[in-house]
C-alpha cells in the first residue's frame, strides 16, 4: 500500500479527521486526550458495521487489532492492504519481531503509545498528538485533529 489516506471517524458527538502518509504513524499524548476513544470508536464500527452509530470514511479498510495473545503475528499476517490501529496495551509493538512483520506487510500501522519504539523505523514527522476543539456539552460535536509533535522547525535545519 502506498500514498496518503484520508480518514474520518465520526459518531453523533465526536469526529476525528486525519491523514495517514506512511507505513508507521505514532499517536502520543497524555491520558484523556482521545487516543483510546479513537480506538473504541473504530472497534465499535468494526464489531457492528451495519448497525454501528460510528461512521468511517476511508479509501482502504481500517482494522483495530485487539488481543490475540501470543498469536499476534499470525493474526496480523491475515490482514492485508489495510490501516491497522494498535493500542499500547499490546506489548509486542516493542519487539523486533513486530518490526519485521511491519517491514514485510502491505498494511499501514497506527500505533497508540506514550513510549518510544526504538525497534521501529518511523519518521519523526509521523508522530502526532490529538488536539480537541469544541464544547463538551451535548449538542455540539467535539472535533479532534492530529497535530505533529515535531514541527517544521526540524525540517528547516
Language-model regions, residue ranges each:
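N-terminal pre-Walker A segment at the start of P-loop NTPase domains
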Residues: 1-16, 137-153
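Conserved lysine of the Walker
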Residues: 35
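The conserved Walker
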Residues: 31
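Post-Walker A alpha-helix
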Residues: 38-40
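A short helix-turn-beta junction within AAA+ P-loop NTPase domains corresponding to the substrate/partner-engaging
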Residues: 121-147
Amino acid at each position: 500500500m502506498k500514498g496518503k489516506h484520508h480518514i474520518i471517524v465520526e459518531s453523533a458527538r465526536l469526529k476525528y479527521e486525519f491523514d495517514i502518509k506512511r507505513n508507521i504513524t505514532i499517536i502520543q499524548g497524555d491520558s484523556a486526550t482521545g487516543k483510546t476513544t479513537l480506538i473504541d470508536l473504530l472497534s465499535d464500527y468494526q464489531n457492528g458495521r451495519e448497525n454501528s452509530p460510528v461512521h468511517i470514511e476511508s479509501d482502504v479498510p481500517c482494522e483495530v487489532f485487539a488481543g490475540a495473545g501470543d498469536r499476534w503475528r499470525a493474526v496480523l499476517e491475515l490482514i492485508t492492504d489495510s490501516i491497522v490501529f494498535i493500542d499500547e496495551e499490546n506489548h509486542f509493538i516493542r519487539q523486533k519481531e513486530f518490526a519485521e512483520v511491519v517491514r514485510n506487510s502491505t498494511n499501514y500501522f497506527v500505533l497508540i503509545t506514550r513510549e518510544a519504539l526504538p525497534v521501529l523505523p518511523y519518521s519523526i514527522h509521523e508522530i502526532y498528538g490529538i488536539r480537541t476543539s469544541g464544547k463538551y456539552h451535548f449538542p455540539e460535536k467535539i472535533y479532534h485533529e492530529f497535530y505533529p509533535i515535531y514541527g517544521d522547525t526540524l525540517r528547516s535545519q
